[in-house]
């Protein structure tokens, strides 16, 4: 069913190797691929134990979670469990090493009076957090972060103790001094807030280096404890307690290779942070931008540790077997050119040092001051003075969102991971105008509009001065490959995302405060430009070669996902059908709806805006338009043939491949057939139905998503289009079919548009498929009709059967409409043996039909429905989900509409994602009140106070009713209404609802929304070398 698809926060580490403690920067991935360490590794946050079902939960229950076997342990556990809470949380947007996600974890109360809860830093996250805690008696309370450590894996949440009414709240004492090798411990955690998990183990190590989890957040410059406890998903942040009921460590991670090894964070630094909070003191954190590792004496000897120093260290610390060794020194940091990799640390401020805990103490107490380090380098003593920096100053606490992307200063975490200087502008959400290639993050900006952007302040000033709709050059590097400078051109969107917003962390409220930095500058008026076209060589038909002047490159960018469409950006080649009016025909797999920006490139030189003029409801093409006055180029109008192309006919194929290069060849039409594009069951989206498809005898046809079939005289006989199909369950990629569409079917529509008339098509609300005469005879078609079919269509002896009815609003079941299984014989006395003959329906309100139903021949008067009402013209964004009327693809696949409020998409890290409201759900009630349409739904949800629970009654696509309770969050996910309005420059206008009041325009708060379409598509639509060709 539609339960939450949250990820349980339990960090896992890969199997052991000889590189057990080496950071991944020392290993280079092959062919620039994403680094996968052969040693310690963990999936990114949004890959933790996704979508656990009942079997998964049972498997977790069967882990060795043995209960206490003594009276002492029973008493201890009974006392501890009341302090442990289950944390359900959202990291509401991508920030630093954390992706936007919804997850569950554990924490425990460490100050009952003030309401402090200790958990992991990878739970609290470095960015915006929104969550709540569930206590052992299932009382719930909101929680917000008051501290997250810049480096170590702990954070502190705050809650209101007065909100817990039905149980006493007690704190679990922190006793880091009681952690010893051989101590028996219990890891007490909550699994999904429902099942108590008590796992037993024995501490086996106190001196393990912090595990490396690969790309993403990792702890460092601390030791970890090790035990065998087999902790499971959701156990991050669990207290590790001894038999006396004291917390001796914090559960932080474990192995992912099946071993039951778990890693615990020592509590020395969490205890200090807690005491600072209790005393109202700042939590100072010092660092010299050098990562140390614990290395045993034998390895230190190989690095040059002198025997006399080893003797002195062993005498001073008889139980120690390790020393601190410099592993990574960041360029341009305090340690740069002073400390070198492989240096063995002996003293800090004349004090012998062997432990991370004491090193942290000294650095945290000397922020802004110099410290003296005594190092052994190749057997020689080296003494250096290093300035201690402020860790908080190199940990981002703000981000800027503009033009659909998000940016902040490069963090110490990222800099340490890749061994680079801790400076630069990091793209934490590479979306909107700043979508670079196929990776969503990891980019460091170098220049924008030929201006350097070394820091966030400079970035803000540069972007402020770029007008809306400008195209500017951007250079950038990826942290995994700083040797390569990438250059691209971006289209700056400051109309869909008009505000430049600064979000700053507020540790007093636990929220991130939003501020408007600048309004968008108006776009610069376009000016006419000249261009010429390439010459198509090696063709014997000059008229065919001239057709390159009829092709234009089209990029369609969608600010919001509607109608189940899986992408935010598509590109393809369009065919100019009227150069004087600037009309272009293109596949609806490229331009799916009109809430979009369209850029048209002519002659690989002139870039102009386009707009949607017409979207065909069935035949997979759209007609868009540009302003021809801006184009001074010999654009040629393609001549569309009025005669149907036939099977076996010779033709010329001109197509554009995946990188936008033209290819051409002489070929033959192999087949013309009524195509049945498979429906996408996971999330219905536009697909072509009731249309003939053409295939040709050339391998080039499968490589090209755009093109034409041309007669020798240059007449276009068919368009070559991309048809969006189903999603492959094995690869999670969207299937695309490349097929031809004969041009005669376009001519009536094109003629009306050329005359300035908006086509008002009508259609039969059914989907047909062809059947052969053997099937038709069995189903009751008479021999007389079969004979007429053989005479009417000598190339294909076929009739058409209704396979699916499209659900129409207010349609009477007994109105004479077609039913599944009906065989169509005639329409308006015309025998129908070709799919193109169905085009008669586009211009008639009623059609006289002869059909065969259940072996009986019937005459019907078939009503057609208006096709101009099938496109989405109204949408609502609420709690991170997109709602609109069920679009045509939904009605094609469903037999009953439960309401006019349909969930089309949702955003990761949002309330809709956390509480399990999934795409393809229908909303029928809000707090028990019927919401049959968007108007009543919007009125109901805007009346709900912020941060309060409400009930949604939903029905799944498979007709299963269920109820979801959600909590409203307007701060990060405001309610916005999108209304199609031709008077607006963009064709749509927005209404934002804040505190139940409506106001025009974009919301002043809210994180950048990156919608996830059902099924989790793999975005394989790689743009060309530049965003705009």
UniProtKB/Swiss-Prot annotation:
Gene3D superfamilies: 2.30.42.10, 2.40.10.120. The active site is at 122 (charge relay system), 153 (charge relay system), 235 (charge relay system). GO terms for molecular function: serine-type endopeptidase activity. One of its GO terms (biological process) is proteolysis. It comes from the Eukaryota. It is found in: Nucleus. Its EC number is 3.4.21.-. Keywords: Apoptosis, Hydrolase, Nucleus, Protease, Repeat, Serine protease. Transmembrane segments: none annotated. Pfam families: PDZ_1, Trypsin_2. Residues 1-49, 997-1029 are annotated as: Disordered. Residues 1010-1022 have a biased composition (Acidic residues). Its main location: nucleus. Residues 84-274 are annotated as: Serine protease. One of its GO terms (cellular component) is nucleus. It is an enzyme of class 3 (hydrolase). Belongs to the peptidase S1C family. This is Pro-apoptotic serine protease NMA111. The gene is NMA111.
């Amino acid at each position: 069913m539609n339960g939450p698809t949250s990820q349980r926060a339990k960090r896992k580490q890969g199997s052991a190797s000889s590189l057990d403690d080496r950071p991944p920067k020392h290993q280079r991935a092959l062919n620039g691929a994403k680094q996968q360490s052969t040693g310690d590794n963990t999936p990114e946050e949004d890959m933790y134990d996704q979508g656990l079902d009942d079997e998964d939960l049972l498997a977790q229950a069967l882990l060795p979670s043995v209960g206490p076997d003594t009276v002492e342990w029973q008493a201890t556990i009974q006392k501890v469990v009341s302090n442990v809470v289950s944390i359900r949380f959202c990291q509401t947007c991508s920030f630093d090493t954390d992706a936007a996600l919804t997850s569950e974890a554990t924490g425990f109360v460490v100050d009952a009076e003030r309401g402090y809860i200790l958990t992991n830093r990878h739970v609290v996250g470095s960015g915006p957090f929104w969550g709540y805690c569930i206590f052992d008696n299932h009382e719930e309370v909101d929680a917000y972060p008051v501290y997250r450590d810049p480096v170590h894996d702990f954070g502190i949440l705050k809650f209101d103790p007065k909100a817990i009414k039905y149980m006493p709240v007690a704190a679990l004492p922190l006793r880091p001094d009681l952690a010893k090798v051989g101590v028996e411990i219990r890891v007490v955690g909550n699994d999904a807030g429902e099942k108590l998990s008590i796992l037993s183990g024995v501490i086996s190590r106190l001196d393990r280096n912090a595990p490396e989890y690969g790309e993403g957040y990792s702890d460092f410059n601390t030791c970890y404890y090790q035990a065998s406890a087999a902790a499971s998903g959701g156990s991050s942040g669990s207290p590790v307690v001894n038999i006396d009921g004291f917390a001796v460590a914090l559960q932080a991670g474990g192995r992912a290779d099946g071993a039951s090894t778990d890693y615990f964070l020592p509590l020395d630094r969490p205890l200090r942070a807690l005491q600072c909070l209790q005393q109202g003191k700042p939590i100072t954190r010092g660092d010299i931008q050098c990562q140390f590792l614990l290395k045993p004496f034998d390895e230190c000897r190989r690095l040059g540790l002198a025997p006399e120093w080893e003797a002195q260290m062993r005498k001073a610390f008889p139980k120690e077997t390790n020393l601190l060794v410099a592993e990574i020194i960041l360029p341009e940091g305090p340690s740069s050119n002073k400390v070198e990799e492989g240096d063995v640390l002996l003293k800090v401020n004349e004090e012998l040092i062997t432990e991370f805990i004491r090193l942290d103490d000294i650095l945290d107490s000397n922020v802004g001051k110099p410290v003296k380090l005594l190092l052994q380098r190749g057997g020689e003593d080296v003494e250096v003075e290093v300035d201690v920096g402020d860790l908080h100053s190199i940990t981002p606490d703000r981000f800027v969102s503009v033009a659909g992307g998000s940016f902040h200063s490069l963090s110490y975490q990222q800099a340490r991971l890749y061994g680079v200087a801790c400076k630069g502008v990091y793209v934490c959400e590479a979306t909107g105008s700043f979508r670079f290639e196929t990776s969503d993050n990891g980019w460091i900006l170098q220049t924008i509009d030929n201006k350097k952007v070394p820091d966030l302040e400079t970035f803000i000033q540069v972007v402020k001065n770029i007008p809306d709709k400008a195209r500017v050059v951007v250079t950038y590097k990826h942290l995994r490959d700083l040797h390569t400078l990438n250059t691209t051109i971006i289209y700056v969107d400051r109309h869909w995302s008009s505000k430049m917003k600064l979000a700053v962390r507020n540790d007093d409220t636990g929220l991130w405060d939003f501020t408007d930095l600048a309004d968008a500058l108006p776009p610069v008026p376009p000016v006419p430009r000249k261009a010429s076209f390439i010459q198509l060589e090696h063709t014997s038909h000059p008229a065919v070669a001239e057709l390159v002047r009829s092709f234009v490159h089209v990029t369609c960018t969608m600010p919001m996902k509607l109608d189940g469409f899986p992408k935010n950006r598509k590109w393809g080649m369009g065919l100019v059908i009227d150069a004087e009016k600037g009309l272009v025909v293109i596949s609806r797999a490229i331009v799916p709806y009109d809430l979009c920006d369209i850029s048209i490139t002519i002659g690989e030189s002139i870039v102009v805006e386009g707009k949607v003029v017409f979207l065909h409801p069935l035949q997979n093409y759209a007609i868009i338009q540009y302003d021809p006055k801006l184009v001074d180029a010999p654009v040629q109008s393609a001549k569309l043939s009025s005669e149907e192309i036939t099977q076996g006919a010779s033709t010329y194929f001109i197509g554009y491949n995946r990188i936008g290069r033209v290819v051409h060849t002489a070929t033959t039409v192999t087949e013309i057939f009524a195509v049945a594009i498979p429906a996408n069951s996971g999330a219905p989206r536009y697909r072509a139905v009731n249309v003939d498809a053409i295939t040709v005898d050339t391998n080039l046809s499968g490589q090209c998503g755009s093109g034409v079939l041309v007669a020798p005289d240059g007449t276009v006989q068919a368009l070559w289009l991309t048809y969006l199909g189903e999603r492959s369950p094995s690869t999670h990629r969207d299937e695309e079919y490349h097929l031809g569409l004969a041009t005669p079917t376009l001519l009536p529509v094109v003629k009306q548009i050329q005359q300035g008339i908006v086509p008002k098509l009508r259609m039969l609300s059914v989907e047909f498929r062809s059947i052969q005469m053997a099937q038709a005879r069995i189903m009751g078609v008479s021999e007389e009709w079969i004979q007429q079919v053989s005479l009417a269509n000598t190339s294909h002896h076929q009739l058409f059967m209704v396979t699916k009815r499209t659900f129409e609003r207010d349609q009477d079941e007994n109105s004479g409409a077609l039913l599944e299984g009906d065989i169509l014989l005639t329409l308006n006395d015309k025998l129908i043996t070709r799919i193109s003959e169905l085009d008669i329906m586009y211009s008639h309100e009623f059609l006289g039909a002869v059909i065969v139903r259940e072996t009986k021949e019937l005459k019907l008067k078939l009503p057609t429905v208006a096709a101009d009402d099938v496109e989405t013209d109204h949408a609502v964004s609420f709690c991170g989900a997109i709602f609109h009327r069920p679009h045509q693809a939904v009605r094609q696949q469903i037999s009953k509409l439960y309401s006019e409020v349909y969930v089309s998409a949702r955003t990761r890290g949002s309330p809709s994602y956390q509480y399990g409201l999934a795409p393809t759900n229908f909303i029928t009630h809000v707090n028990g009140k019927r919401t049959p349409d968007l108007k009543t739904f919007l009125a109901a949800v805007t009346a709900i106070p912020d941060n309060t629970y409400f009930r949604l009654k939903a029905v799944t696509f498979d007709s299963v009713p269920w109820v979801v309770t959600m909590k409203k969050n307007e701060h990060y996910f405001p309610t916005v209404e999108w209304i199609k309005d031709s008077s607006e420059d963009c064709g749509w206008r927005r209404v934002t609802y804040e505190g139940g009041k409506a106001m025009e325009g974009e919301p002043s708060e809210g994180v950048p929304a990156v919608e996830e379409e059902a099924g989790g598509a793999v975005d394989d639509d790689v743009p060309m070398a530049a965003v705009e060709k």
